[in-house]
From Swiss-Prot:
PANTHER family: UDP-N-ACETYLMURAMOYLALANINE--D-GLUTAMATE LIGASE (PTHR43692:SF1). It catalyses: UDP-N-acetyl-alpha-D-muramoyl-L-alanine + D-glutamate + ATP = UDP-N-acetyl-alpha-D-muramoyl-L-alanyl-D-glutamate + ADP + phosphate + H(+). One of its GO terms (cellular component) is cytoplasm. Pfam families: Mur_ligase_C, Mur_ligase_M, MurD-like_N, MurD_N. Belongs to the MurCDEF family. The keyword ATP-binding applies. It is found in: Cytoplasm. It comes from Thermotoga sp. (strain RQ2). One of its GO terms (biological process) is regulation of cell shape. It comes from the Bacteria. Cell wall formation. Catalyzes the addition of glutamate to the nucleotide precursor UDP-N-acetylmuramoyl-L-alanine (UMA). Its EC number is 6.3.2.9. This is UDP-N-acetylmuramoylalanine--D-glutamate ligase.
Length: 430
């Protein structure tokens, strides 16, 4: 048997290491970029054939090709493989094929999925279960096959689900769906279909928890599992209360809108698993939200600073804005072909001043109209401008609305830069 790897990113690296231990086969790695010396040494030591700097027809000789999630469907090598009937799969699919689906909790959504995944892992672990945390969040799922776990909590991206043939699992949560990754997916409909793929594979004994607004995007009549929507009369959250199955519970703290949505969705899963929420609310007390997600940094001269660098879509930015009355907003990065006219219409009542830099400024600028705005060159200039146009009591919010790769290695580096500027300007930390 000959197994191919199209792209050699994090997930395919973990998959190859697993298969080298557990399967007799010949392996072939095809990577568009140049492989580093350490990677080449590893491949050569394990007699793994490879090519770099592009993909060739050698992949056609493989019985199965594992696709890295970031590979776009319209690439020439994918078109070639598909035209020849090649079997394509993913690291995620191999994992799901080798575990009890009842132990898997899959979480997806346009925004908030990392926080929800971390929260689900937190409450299960603190309850005493040996719980694996991974998927699109940190550790590739296949690494969990080397151990024994009570539960596997996985963040799932639309890319992973698109390339997985049959991602079946018993517990599935969809937080929200809005326009995103339209630079990767051929249409919004394809994006929605990818996100919801596991739901339509579930059977009557399974559980599907989802945001009610999804019913406007896709007919869910074909889903056979138990469907529980939230943001309904029975399941919703206010600033101080959680309502699950019509019963009220007091939240143990103050949370921004996005975090309340995560708490609400995860609490429903928890209720279905354990038939009570009192312990969930107690465990929630010591859950620490992830950085770069509505992270309150502190104050400078009475101005309040928030780092929301993880917000890489306009939907996420609107969610951040919903927590405030008027905001000095910093947006930057690479946009995702969203409807910026509609975004500006929805955001404008919340904006005291809009500061933009990076590629997204070119896409946003034609729509800002009479909104006070500035276009700057970089984060340093954006920070200075925010200080200049704000006054005591104002909120200064970094919520980029775009990917970071035009100027930063990732969203975390972008958020760290914003935090460094805050500290350099004498910010009083929380």
């Amino acid at each position: 048997m000959r197994i191919g790897f199209l792209g050699f990113g994090k997930s395919n690296r973990s998959l190859l290491k697993y298969l080298l231990k557990h399967q007799e086969a010949k392996f072939f790695v095809s990577e568009a970029k140049t492989l580093d010396g350490e990677t080449k040494k590893f491949l050569e030591e394990h007699s793994v054939e490879y090519e770099e700097g592009g993909h060739t027809e050698k992949l056609l000789d493989c019985d199965v090709v594992y696709v890295s999630p970031g590979i776009k469907p319209d690439t020439s090598i994918i078109k070639l493989l598909s035209s020849r009937g090649a079997k394509l799969s993913t690291e995620l699919q191999l994992f799901l094929d080798n575990v009890d689906p009842k132990k898997v909790v899959g979480i997806t959504g346009t925004d908030g999925k990392s926080t929800a995944t971390a929260l689900m892992h937190h409450v299960l672990s603190r309850r005493g279960f040996k719980t694996f945390l991974g998927g699109n969040f940190g550790t590739p799922a296949v690494e969990a096959l080397e151990g024994e776990y009570d539960y596997y909590v996985l963040e799932m991206s639309s890319f992973q689900l698109f390339w997985s043939e049959r991602p079946y699992l018993s517990n599935f949560l969809v937080l929200n769906i809005s326009e995103d990754h339209l630079d990767w997916h051929s249409s919004f409909e394809e994006y929605v279909d990818s996100k919801l793929k596991p739901a339509f594979l579930q059977t009557e004994g399974d559980l599907f928890v989802y945001n009610k607004h999804i019913e406007r995007l896709r007919n869910l009549e074909g889903v056979r599992s138990r469907k529980i929507p939230f943001w309904t009369g029975e399941n919703f959250a206010t600033e101080r209360e959680l309502i699950v199955h019509g019963k009220k519970y007091t939240l143990p703290g103050n949370y921004p809108y996005q975090t309340r949505e995560n708490i609400l969705a995860v609490s429903i899963l928890y209720m279905e698993m354990f038939n009570e929420l009192e312990s969930f609310l107690e465990l929630l007390r010591d859950f620490k939200p992830l950085p770069h997600r509505m992270e309150y940094l502190g104050q400078i001269d009475g101005r309040h600073f928030y780092n929301d660098s993880k917000a890489t879509s306009t939907h996420a930015v609107l969610g951040a804005l919903s927590n405030f009355d008027k905001v000095v907003l910093i947006m930057c990065g690479i946009g995702k072909k969203e409807n910026y006219s509609l975004f500006v219409e929805k955001a404008s009542p919340k904006l005291k001043h809009l500061i933009m830099f990076g590629e997204i400024s070119k896409e946003l600028a034609p729509f800002v109209g009479k909104i006070p705005h500035s276009i700057v060159e970089n984060m340093e200039e954006a920070f200075e401008k925010a200080m200049e146009v704000s006054e005591k009591g104002d909120v200064i919010l970094l919520s980029p609305g775009g990917a970071s790769f035009d100027m930063y290695e990732n969203y975390a580096k972008r958020g760290e830069h914003f935090r460094e500027l805050f500290e350099r300007h004498g910010g009083d930390k929380v």
